[in-house]
Amino acid sequence: METRLRYLIASGQVESRVVAPVPWFPLKGERFGHYGTLAKVPQRETRNDIDVTHPRYLVLPRVGMNVTPYTLAHAAKREIGRILDSGYDFDAIDAHYFYPDGVAAVMLGKYFNKPVVITARGTDINLIPQFARPRQLILDAARDADGIITVCKALKDEMVGLGVAPDNITPLRNGVDLERFAPLDRAAARAAVGLAPGRFTLLSVGLLDPRKAHDLIIRALPQLPDVDLLIAGIGPEKNNLERLARELNVQDRVKLLGSVPQTELKTYYNAADTLVLASSREGWANVLLESMACGTPVVASDVWGTPEVVAAPAAGVLMPQRTPEGLVAALSQLRANYPEHSATRRYAEDFGWQPTTQGQIDLFHSILARKAA
């Protein structure tokens, strides 16, 4: 989201203020889990020269999913009012994730009489509509939104299947920052992160939770004796992943890196031989293109928007099944026809941000023209 906005602002045709509400929680610290971490988020900050405010909204246990759009809208409403009172007017609300943010954005659009564009990104469409009340709120928001963006065609198809009018949905894929993620000297990168020479190294990047399926990769390792695995991310599955590696006697070949800043991820992408994404759900996984931009091919599960990213031999291979055996088969296929790193980089270069940026600008202009007519 931040990168997409940076490129949009860099076009010189858009300016923006960001209101990014976070749940209210009274105590700070990792021992309080996700909410304790969110409590440390500042009220205001500047990121890449973009002013961002983080008003707090109430999340209620047990009933939280159904009422969160309303508490989020209430918190954002006060902050948007302050922004308007400061003399900064705006033309449209650009919301990311349909639920709860997009639902709240439509409420705010009605209150402030501003058009609303909502971007669907993944679980907001392929998971949350399984719950009756959120599903209805999502459909209501989709009906009332002035424009809808999906980060892949698969999400548009899913929304149409839910009953959303296709004419109001514009697929605009995420791009990749080709300057931030670029090839390095691979031997130097491997040495920098301490990789053993001669070992084929997999990298898995993402939150340590069941949906990301890092465990599936670990379960494949007994069938891959010359392969090591690096996992970058934090989350509730850390202890379970470590335990699984010990049970399978592959603990010496699995290294959990913890949280890795984006500035350092480039080194890991260049050091690895393959990025593996075994997720059960993805809209458009940025890590795939980040890896390819560094010249490293991928092996990925054949879900949602991923086939739209991994669409040529230079990009990598899709797993025939989301199983350890499927991963082993895909890796065997990749290693038998391993692409040149330069070819993988060239493939990624077709996924820069400019087409997406222009697509957003065109969409905003068309919506504002309709409103003015």
Placement of each model-derived feature along the sequence:
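A short helix/loop element that forms part of the nucleotide-sugar donor recognition site in Leloir-type
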Residues: 36-41, 182-195, 341-343
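Conserved donor-binding/catalytic core segment of Leloir-type glycosyltransferases
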Residues: 196-212, 218-221, 230
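Aromatic "clamp/platform" in nucleotide-sugar-dependent glycosyltransferases that forms part
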Residues: 261, 280
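Conserved acidic donor-binding segment of nucleotide-sugar-dependent glycosyltransferases
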Residues: 312-313, 317-324, 333-338
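Short alpha-helical donor nucleotide-sugar binding micro-motif in glycosyltransferases
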Residues: 259-260, 267-272
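Donor nucleotide-sugar binding/catalytic pocket of nucleotide-sugar-dependent glycosyltransferases
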Residues: 17-24, 118, 134-186
